């Protein structure tokens, strides 16, 4: 920072926008340009929606399940062994030993149900080491996972139906 230049906390705000030039079409902005100017790109309505929508979905998922007596759990993401049989895993060097990134919280959710917790959920990262050689395949994503005791599969279907309707209604009413 140049100390000879006076610093100010002032900002410029505008109540309106007016285009100074006329254009018949919007310019094409490449992904490389967008990534090179990431802070500007993140200010666009589209990119802000990319951040906002998953945040709302996770919030409403959590709220809905909490109202239906679910307990939120947080399961380990580094494990001493592969948790899913036959699937590829991410092997991580961990203080001189091997560890693996968790593929899902399934084992821990089942343990909670067996321990009479009845209803549990987790929002957290999931890692899949499947080599699909496609840009459309995610090896890491945020999972919205739930587990519950049921007497009939209609119990689960009814809960999930209500939850999805709730989430989509909130998205439509607040942001649609």
Residue ranges and their predicted role:
Residues 1-176:
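Class II aminoacyl-tRNA synthetase catalytic cores and aaRS-like
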């Amino acid at each position: 920072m140049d100390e000879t230049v006076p610093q100010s906390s002032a900002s410029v705000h505008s109540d309106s926008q007016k285009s100074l030039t006329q254009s018949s079409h919007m310019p094409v902005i490449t992904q490389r340009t967008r990534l090179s100017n990431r802070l500007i790109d993140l200010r666009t309505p589209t990119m802000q929606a990319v951040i906002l929508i998953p945040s709302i979905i996770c919030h409403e998922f959590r709220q809905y399940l909490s109202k239906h007596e679910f307990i939120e759990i947080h399961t380990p993401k580094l494990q001493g062994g592969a948790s899913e049989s036959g699937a590829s895993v991410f092997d991580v060097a961990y203080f001189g030993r091997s560890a693996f990134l968790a593929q899902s919280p399934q084992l821990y959710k089942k343990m909670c149900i067996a321990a009479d917790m009845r209803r549990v959920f987790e929002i957290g990262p999931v890692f899949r080491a499947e080599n699909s050689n496609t840009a459309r395949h995610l090896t890491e994503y945020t999972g919205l996972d739930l587990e519950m005791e049921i007497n009939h599969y209609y119990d689960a279907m009814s809960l999930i139906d209500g939850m999805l309707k709730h989430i989509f209604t909130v998205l439509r009413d607040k942001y649609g």
